[in-house]
Design a protein with these regions (language model features):
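ALDH superfamily catalytic-core signature
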Residues: 79, 86-87, 154-189
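Buried, small/hydrophobic-residue-enriched core segments of structured protein domains
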Residues: 58, 72, 144-153, 164, ...
Length: 189
């Protein structure tokens, strides 16, 4: 299947990790992300508190610039794309050069799936020939950055002038907002 193809291709291209680990990330992390948010409201009125005259409204941010590492190219682009598209945002993925072919393969699969669901393919785009200049330009032009990678890359995202969320080596960004079940979130974190 597709997951097996991507797992093997990732290991072959990057020479990082192993097939079983990559396959499990695809199966577990990407599906878990989708299942965690599939029923959540992500645009429009997401909550009403009539007793306080409060209506919470979520809206798209625009174009998300996603910086992805060579160490997890099989799952990171998918997870970022799920989150972006769920919020009716477009996403442009800037892969590490060592994982550019894996990224292209995954983006092509995602674009096909998006079209099959009746949405425009260009909601998900990738930089097929990545370079530092192109990534820097993406960070200047996009509306929000989601950066996953080494300290220098995440630091560049934070100092780009564009609002950014970054995940460095061994860390994970977890946003717990006021719509979260705090007991459940604490247990999972």
């Amino acid at each position: 299947g597709v997951a097996e193809e991507i797992a093997q291709f990732t290991v072959d291209e990057t020479q990082l990790g192993n097939y079983d680990g990559k396959f499990l990330k695809i199966q577990r992390k990407t599906r878990a992300t989708l299942m965690d948010i599939i029923d959540d409201k992500s645009v429009g009125i997401i909550e009403e508190l009539p007793e306080r005259n409060i209506v919470k409204i979520a809206k798209p941010m625009g174009v998300i610039g996603a910086l992805c590492p060579s160490t997890n190219p099989e799952a990171t682009p998918v997870i970022k794309a799920i989150s972006a598209v769920k919020g009716r945002n477009a996403i442009i993925i800037a892969p590490h050069p060592r994982a550019k072919l894996t990224n292209k393969m995954i983006c092509d699969y995602m674009r096909d799936a998006i079209v099959a669901m009746g949405a425009p393919a260009d909601l998900v785009q990738s930089i097929d020939v990545p370079s530092l200049d192109k990534t820097n330009e993406l960070m200047r032009q996009c509306d929000r950055i989601l950066a996953t990678g080494g300290e220098a890359m995440v630091g560049a995202a934070y100092s780009s002038g564009t609002p950014a969320l970054g995940v460095g080596v061994g860390n994970a960004v977890i946003t717990v907002d006021d719509t979260a079940n705090l007991d459940e979130a604490a247990e999972k974190i």
